[in-house]
Amino acid sequence: MKKLFVFLMIAFVGVVLVACDNTPKNEGKTIYLNYAGTASDKGFNEGLFEDFKAARKAAGDKNTYVIEYLEIGPDVVDSTVLDWTAPNAPDVYEAASDKIGILYQKGALAKLGGKYAEFIDNYMAGFGATLVTMNGSYYAYPYTGDNTYYLQYDKSVFGEEDVKSIEGLLDKAEAEGYKVAYNLETAFWGAAALFTFGADYSTSYDEDGNVIEIKANFNGAEGLKAAKAIYKIMQHPAWVNDSGVPSAESDVRATIGGTWDIANFKNRYGEDYGCAVMPTVTVDGDTKHLGCFVGGKFLGVNPQVSKGDSDRLVAAHELAMYLSGKEAQTKRYENFGIAPCHSEAKQHPSMVNDPNMIVLNEQAKFGHPQDAVPAAFWSAPGTFVGGIKDGTITLENIQEAIDTLNNSIIGAPAE
């Protein structure tokens, strides 16, 4: 009964959002909001809050905004906040893109309507919009789009042609006495490689966020080719399983490395630092870029904590929209190197000429959005890769292995 009440309340305030033209009442009241975000970014975010207040004032808004900062990071907000109706629950909060299914099920995501949905359509179309879509509607505001990995390498060893394909990369490394690191034993890398030739999963939900069905076709022709690609890479003598920045003593000279380590890779290779999109792989005459996840972070608006106060709920939407807007995303890039997903922010002169941004934008064209991921997708591929490593999975029984993998994925609940 309590859950039913929560969703009826969310539906009510959603109607209010559309009916009131999506603008807080201009009566000069004080609106209190709680914001949950990364502890280390508190000072930066509080500066953005002041920018938001100034922008609201310039727009003729007479309200006063008091914003309390809760140090709850985007990777743990779903498990840290136990009661989304509590007075200290966040109105607006940061979350990793793969948390959307969990938060939707908790009723912690307000559906976007009116100008807020138009904001997503106008500036986040494509990748960003995909990250915040559930059951055909938008439920959050994306504000980053750079949680991925791609090739980071030593240009004194590899040329532009070498890094175009994984075969060329591995062969060149072997010829020069070096190694290529690709962390296939970890699901974020290895599981995503299964997307290479077009195999995928899909999850359908009911209106309460419960999983209705998980579908997957990794046991089909596309999945089989991806499995063979993983097998081929792991059998190459130049391949090693790693994703970290190699030490000066290491023989690794190319890594499928995370965007969070860009600065460290640059420090390691200096002027010889190079970067490129995921290399291609060829199986049975078919050539595709190796699959990868591309995730990001979004700002969720919690409709439960406002308890029917439409001014507070709309103010939360206004804050979330501002913090995911062009100016805020540009400032994150300028201060932290965090790549934006806002279409206009991407056109900033410093980004257009940034090699890492160029690679990221190209990779986003074929990378797999990291949204709600079936739970077993984080474990089943690990079993598969482990079988290749220990020799129990060979080309002779690889179809049987991916049949088992696929059955594990569709039989598990989504996270």
Short names for language-model regions:
Residues 81-83, 90-91, 118-153, 179, ...:
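A structural signal for short loop-to-beta-strand junctions that line the ligand-binding cleft
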Residues 14-101, 404-415:
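Conserved N-terminal structural module of periplasmic/extracytoplasmic solute-binding proteins
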Residues 208-242:
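Glycine-centered hinge/linker elements that transmit conformational signals in sensory
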Residues 95-149, 161-167, 274-277:
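Hinge/lid segment of periplasmic solute-binding proteins
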Residues 267-335:
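Extracytoplasmic/periplasmic substrate-recognition and gating elements
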Residues 70-80, 238-249, 260:
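Short helix-initiation/N-cap motifs at beta->coil->alpha
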Residues 333-387:
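Long, aromatic- and glycine/proline-rich binding clefts that accommodate carbohydrate-like moieties
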Residues 137-143, 149, 167-222, 252-254:
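Extracytoplasmic/periplasmic solute-binding protein
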